[in-house]
Amino acid sequence: MTDVTKDIDNLADALLTMEISPEINDLMEKLALNLTSSNNLPVDVKHLLTSIKTYLTQSSSEMLDYNLLLEVLDAVVGLCPFEDVLKVFSVDDLITALKSGDKALTETVCQVIAAASPRDIFAGTPLLDEMLKLYFCESTVVAIVNALEKTLGILVTNQLNRRRILENNLPVLISVKDCKNSTTFCRFLDLIKILSASVTFEEFRKDIFIIDNMVTNKMMENDILVFIHICQYYIELLTISLTEDGKEWVIRYVKPSFEIFGEAFSRREELFDVGHFAKSYLLTLFSKISYLDDKSYIQLLEAQFFPLYPDKQYLDEFLTVLDPSYIAKVHLDLLKEKALRAGNVHMFVNLIKDEDCFVQLKDEINSKTLNDMPYIEKMLLLDGLTLTSYGIQHLTRNMPSVMNSIIDSGNQVTEKLSFDLRLRVFENLLEANPQELSVWLIPLQSEYANILNGRRGRFSSGQLADDYL
């Protein structure tokens, strides 16, 4: 009998007999680790699954760590044939558990459902319907909502599951979209955000996936949390259209909503909550719009709602987030008077992604300015600068003292962010053409080896752990 088999049997027996001791958590932690690193199960685990089910439905103990139990369950259902799982957790059992209102039991059920194989095995059952009922119930606690969202995010990658949600539950979706309850409406937004990553053009229903501008305007004026949720949803739609092949059609549906967000920004002083809580989301949304191939969208928004002129207080905020190629094409003149300082490093990092913008700004990126900067801001700028060949040429040919400071600054690395930034600068440089590095190649390689081998400028494992905590 292997150690894993023995641990499975011991855990199953303890759960079945309800004999829970403090040592059970150590047993579950060990078993979860061993199962996670394994490719197969050495024994039939229906006995363990039955014990988990029996324990969760009939008992509870403050000594038992339910998160560890879920880790064990997740590892088990990921390794055993799903038909074995269904022999223990039938569809009726899963539905009953969802209706129970019990947090631990519901999270367990979500783990089982998420492991469904084939993915659409539950599409012809009421299981997804019950999940949606529980999800949209205002009294459902956040932990269960999170578990449901995670599980639905896995299930909706399958077409039959999406059909069950979008067709069989269409009346439910329309009802919650029109409801007056902010909590329920925000959950609806989160659900369609999850769905939007997988839906096809044929499945994308405007009456479900697009929020009426009147609703957005009302939330902008009266409920800032819902308005932020709407912003996040449209940011996700724009991200999908920008990053996923074949999803460009999303733009035709979202572009009629662009103006309402421009109006929100223009009214930020009038609407206190928008100016103080939603502005960063609006800037992110405008950033996404600026990266669309058709630059007329951002150009029209700018002209109407946030014209970019030197005297505008918000100018630097937009120069920090907008596509620098758009800035280069339309507003290169705005960069003439921009001086590099620690407070606007992020703006420079964004702008120098475009070579025309870089040419306009490169005189500001000099040895004196960089060497006078705080270390982290200096490394942030260098991280951006070393991502382009023209930036590397400027650095290696025109700023020898900065190059020396990169190589010799190991002792200035005092916390993890400094370490990570410096490491990225080295990696960016060493990925460049060796001829561009010239005399700097060997010193860079030598110091990079020192970093990797822990001889200089590197933390002990304890220091790194402390920083993460």
UniProtKB/Swiss-Prot annotation:
GO cellular component, one term: cytoplasm
Subcellular location: Cytoplasm
Gene: HSM3
CDD domains tied to this protein: Hsm3_like
Protein name per Swiss-Prot or TrEMBL: DNA mismatch repair protein HSM3
Protein role: Involved in DNA mismatch repair in slow-growing cells. Acts as a chaperone during the assembly of the 26S proteasome, specifically of the base subcomplex of the 19S regulatory complex (RC).
Main location as per UniProt: cytoplasm
Gene3D superfamilies (UniProt xref): 1.25.10.50, 1.25.40.580
UniProt keyword annotations, A-Z: Chaperone, Cytoplasm, DNA damage, DNA repair
Family, similarity comment: Belongs to the proteasome subunit S5B/HSM3 family.
One biological process term in Gene Ontology: DNA repair
